[in-house]
Amino acid sequence: MTEESLRPSRLEHAQHPVAIVHEGFFVYANALFLQRLGYRSFDDLQAVPLLDMVDERYHERLREHLDAAKKSAGTEQRHPQTKLTLHRADDLPLSAGCTSFRTRFGGEDCVQLNLTTAGDANLLGRLGALPWRHYLSLLFLLLFTVLPSTLLLKLNINNAPDVYFPDDEPAVVLDRELRTRFPNDQVFVLLFEGVALFSDGFLDAYDGLRRSLEKLPEIDEVVAVTTQDHIAGTQDDFIVEPLIDVRTLAQSRPADRQERVLQDELSKGVMAAADGSALAMVAIPKKSGNSIERLALEEQILAAVQDARLKGYLVAMAGQIPLDVAQLRSMLRDNMIFIPATVATGLTLIWWLFRRWLAVMLAGVAIGVVTNSTVAIYVLLDQPFTLVSSIIPPLLSALTVAALVHLFNGLFIASKLGYSGAERVARAIQEVDRPALFAALTTAGGLASLGTSPIVPIKTFGLISALGTLLIYLVVFRILPNIVVRWDKRPWTNVRGSAHLVDGIVSALYRFGIRQPALVIGMVCVLLALGAPQLRNVVVETNLQEFFDFNHPVREQTRYIEDKLVGTMAVSVIFDADARDGLKDPRTLQLIRDFQQWSKAQPEIDRSFGLPDFVQEMHWAFNAENPAFRQLPDDRELITQYLLIYDGEDIYDFVDRDFQHSQIALNINVHSANDISRVLENIREYLRDNVGDALRWEIAGNGRLFADMEDLLVSGQVYSLWGALVLIFVFMLFFLRSFWAALLCMIPNLSPIFLIFVIMGLTGIWLDMATAMIASVAIGIAVDDTIHV
């Protein structure tokens, strides 16, 4: 590139007003010159002769000065100087010193004018002439690159089920109250298989693992066959002892221990497989904790298994917490893949379209600033970063690339029109700023509509991603142009085979649409008619197990444990009496026992366990283990006596010490929200018909929370869609100032939603937490294209 072609770019960054004149007319002026003379653009200045701009008293002085300047080369150390009074565009006078010399511009001999005003002569004026916008923009990018990165170290990564519900949700309030009395139902279930499971060596190692886990500060209780209460009968009494007492292993044989475990009614199906081929251990945390804490706890448990030399025996681990940990690992792995892939794809696209390293570097910086700053908002607002939140980085990366393409395309067009430097940037911004602003507002509106969702992570995602969209506009159309003015010196040239290919495809499509409107509209109507019936096939369903492949370890291990033992989905049915000791009433216990018998007959319920099981086992043991007495006694005083004699602890996991509040723990073998909802509705129907007002009852637990999420999801989807459509219509109405035009523009905004649900109905994709957000996101992205059209 020649020195002459580089000169305007250098003059743009000069710290004083500079202009070039040829034959008395301006052929170039930098931004400072236009600013000092009060002109908005060079187009306004170009038509004004230099002589008309100078006060009439100085015309002769100007002519003499220009003649002298034509004889002075730019390389000389001293150049002709003079003082002039110029007329600004607003007719105000401007006194300035003028230093001029001969230069080349556009292949012609010209004169370069360098002005020095009163403001430029003093320190404040010189400081004011510095490119502060450039410096401040660089400072902004630096700060918003560094500061968010420090905040991200405090990011609370938490995908635990608790964070998905509002605090005042009835199921949450009920579960919170339940956990004040009874242990957590989100647990680790460990299953061991191998030879000689009931041998001295294995049981010693097994109990050693139990003791190690109990020492962990995060663990509240460990349920194992070596600590589980076993109620044994005598001739006139009963005793409570460990199911297997490791202190007395020498007094028993492995076969006897196995038979004792398999025949124990309190642990049947829970602590051992029916054929004795597997033993279980259940670790119950003190609190749920966030996902990172759960991951750390799982690793501690596995380390304890390793230390106990039982790793070869551990064949499966399941429960809500291992499932959450698997989701966390999947989320982190996917983010490590898709975020770099999205950024790399975007940067490759920028290079392919424009072949300009400056554009690629600015795109990388912009994507980093936008995504890091937006995710850092989670830290500032003390909100958990969930599986839902992980959509933000790739989404905002893609939206940032889209905005950058508009900016760079504007610069390319301005360059083709002959603009350079600040004028090129100003022309590009003038072309794209208004549609870019409305696109940002409407896209943010579509995302913010998710703020109406009652599911907290979806609401937070919508509001924070909306802020991120507005940040894209600020960075791309307000910050980066100041950088481009400083560093963009070369013209933007046509790129063979890239932008031409895209333009060719777009041109072919719109030409076909304009030439064949009836055919296009007819085809669209036919497709709508064919797709509409599929909307009825959209199924609202969530199954966390289905988030993983069928052969994923967490699904395989869950299936294996449920085949060997019982279902891992926990539901608690609460029964409360009106007064203390109310649950000692035989009629009350029989009502609860009848419910248990009914629930055990349901195919989805593998186990129903609670206070009546303990009382029944005490009655059986007290009567010399006579099978005829394995039932509830009908004498309140006898029940009271049994409970007084009982000196174990396991019963208090199911009833409080006042015998007023109790829970029946159900183990369910289904995991989808709809299946769980059907089970819960059947339970409610039974309790309404058979218990009624005789006892206060309610359903709680992890299963209830998960099932209620379905209703929240549906209501949130309806509210967010309507909110997005109304908000975008208002934006369109304001932008177009026409009701019918705004209504017409809603068609391309609704089309992606319609297509999404048609595809979901056709392919059987569920409407769950992940797909529920796609509609609102699609509206926001679709309206971007509508605005630009």
Predicted segments with their positions:
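Short loop/turn elements at sensory-signaling interfaces that couple input to output
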Residues: 98-114
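Extracytoplasmic
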Residues: 176, 180, 248-357, 590-593, ...
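Interfacial helix-loop-helix hairpins and adjacent transmembrane helices
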Residues: 120-142, 426, 474-528
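PAS-family sensory/regulatory domains
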Residues: 44-57
